Regions:
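Short hydrophobic alpha-helices and adjacent helix-cap/hinge residues
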Residues: 4-222
Length: 222
């Protein structure tokens, strides 16, 4: 956590934990337990309130409306610290138009596509990233599926999805030099009809040759 923000000598802090998805996610209880255990081990007494953004369901504009409501509730509770889980929660928090994340400490976790310039402008933010190594994933994919020679990258039009595609394309450059027999294409699920996407990926005559990568979870995968 941010040095000097919470300490064992101070008690009863109000902590807001914003998760990117829903409480039906299989890992959400582990995240909550991890935060509560960490606070307890640090000797910090805190009231932890959990909010869920449900980013898989809403458009970004709707996420911003929801996040502003979350911030207003947090402000009314006199929240001392915000903790976020995964990219969507932090990105929407800092782009929803509310000033709260710029006024109090924010701890991030599980950020795959960090915006370094934003972090530089927010000295009140700390935490850790978990950047995906797509070079390792591509190598493992072809080891498991040696007969599949076409890499398909699924994306949507969101900022985070675009950042994910950039990361995959960067890994693809070195991968393709090592494995020139492979091909690569990106499919944006918001630029093609659902039927055409399903047909081209799942029911096409050559579908058994595809390795599909989704650098960011998108509702299409549901």
């Amino acid at each position: 956590m941010i040095s000097g923000t919470l300490s064992a000598a101070e008690t009863n802090y109000n902590v807001l934990f914003i998760q990117s998805y829903t409480n039906s996610s299989s890992w959400h209880n582990n995240l909550i337990a991890g935060l509560q255990d960490g606070l307890e081990e640090g000797g910090v007494k805190a009231n932890v309130v959990i909010e869920y953004l449900n980013a898989d369901f809403w458009t970004f504009a709707s996420e911003c409306v929801i996040m502003r409501r979350i911030c207003e509730r947090a402000r009314q509770r006199k929240t001392d610290l915000i903790v976020t889980s995964s990219d969507e929660a932090f990105f929407t928090l800092t782009h929803c138009g509310d000033s709260l994340p710029y006024q109090i400490p924010v701890v991030v976790s599980g950020i795959k596509y960090p915006d370094r310039k934003l972090f530089d402008r927010m000295p009140n933010v700390s935490g850790f990233t978990s950047v995906t190594d797509f070079n390792v994933l591509l190598e493992e994919a072809i080891r498991l599926f040696p007969a599949r020679k076409e890499i398909v990258c699924l994306s949507d039009s969101s900022f985070l999805s675009a950042k994910g595609v950039e990361a995959v394309e960067e890994a693809w450059e070195s991968f393709h030099k090592k494995h020139p027999e492979y091909s690569f294409k990106e499919l944006n699920v918001q630029r093609k009809s659902l039927n055409s996407l399903i047909t081209s990926i799942c029911y096409d005559y050559h579908a058994h040759k595809y390795i599909v990568i989704a650098p960011k979870w998108i509702p299409f995968l549901s």
